Regions:
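Sec-dependent bacterial lipoprotein signal peptides
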Residues: 1-22
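Short, well-ordered beta-strand segments
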Residues: 42-46, 142-144, 175
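Hydrophobic residues within well-ordered alpha-helices
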Residues: 70, 92-93, 168-171, 214
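Short, polar loop motifs at secondary-structure junctions
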Residues: 103-105, 130-133, 146-152, 178-182
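A ligand-binding cleft/hinge motif common to bilobed small-molecule-binding domains
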Residues: 102-113, 168-196
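Extended ligand-binding regions for polar small-molecule ligands
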Residues: 23-25, 61-73, 132-156, 195-236
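Hydrophobic/proline-rich hinge and linker segments of small-molecule sensing/allosteric domains
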Residues: 40-47, 114-135, 201-204
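Extracytoplasmic small-molecule ligand-binding "clamshell" domains
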Residues: 22-104, 109, 151, 162-163
Length: 236
């Protein structure tokens, strides 16, 4: 074989291997997606209403319903496991769980250790007013925020005084909350944007086939998310 033919042979072999490699992607090193077809899906739950809600019976919440439907599409059922965020993500890192849900966002520091879906819902926060009210600037103004909502820090950074409440829907004054909730309350949203969060679901590291399948499922639900959140809050 002369030098020209040798180079051509090497090039053909390289291209063949490249095509074969692309054809087999995405892959799951631990074959999580294949395993889920043959057993229950192990789902880690982190309590975070309205995404994940603990009840006396079966868990509830928007992401709980999403994963329940996703499992059904795969021909399996979810096996629920409650725990704290760190505990659940550590278990996921070591492939002891298949999915973790709990209102996680792409700001999580765990992206170095586990996998995540693409952001499937953008949650934007604004200050809003009851119908007929006007406000030029929230500086020095009392703004109600539901207890436990981290957007309170953003409100304070704008110079407003935070009033923590159990249920913002009962407030008759300025409120800081997610846009989907403000719409449900029929409040008038101001131009005072406070924050914007991209929601994701956690999966084991490197399980690309599972991520791809879950991404495809979540994409089909993108226009339903606002309504699902509003329905969940209305159940309270």
């Amino acid at each position: 074989m002369n030098q020209m033919n040798l180079k051509r042979s090497i090039l053909i072999t390289f291209l063949a291997l490249s095509v074969f490699g692309c054809a087999t992607l995405p892959r799951d090193p631990k074959e999580t997606l294949r395993q889920i077809h043959a057993r229950p899906m192990r789902v880690g739950l982190v309590e975070h209403p309205p995404w994940v809600v603990r009840t006396n019976g079966e868990p509830a919440g928007v992401e709980v319903d999403l994963i329940r439907n996703f499992a059904s599409e795969l021909g399996t059922t979810p096996d629920w496991h409650w725990g704290g965020e760190q505990e659940q993500l550590e278990a996921l890192q070591h492939y002891q769980l298949d999915v973790v849900i709990g209102g996680l966002t792409d700001r999580t520091p765990w992206s170095k250790y586990v996998g995540f879906t693409s952001p499937y819902f953008k949650e934007t926060y604004h200050v809003a007013l009851p119908p007929g009210s006007q406000l030029q600037n929230i500086k020095g103004t009392e703004v109600s925020v539901e207890k436990g909502d981290p957007v309170a820090a953003e409100v304070e950074s704008k110079g407003a005084r935070v009033v923590r409440v159990d249920d913002s829907s009962n407030v008759n004054g300025p409120v800081a909350a997610a846009d989907w909730k403000l719409e449900q309350m029929s409040f008038t949203v101001t131009n005072e944007e406070l924050d914007s969060l991209q929601h994701v679901i956690a999966v084991p590291p490197g399980e690309n086939a599972l991520v791809k399948r879950l991404d495809e499922f979540l994409y089909t639900k993108r226009f339903e998310m606002k309504g699902l959140l509003q329905q969940q809050v209305a159940k309270r």
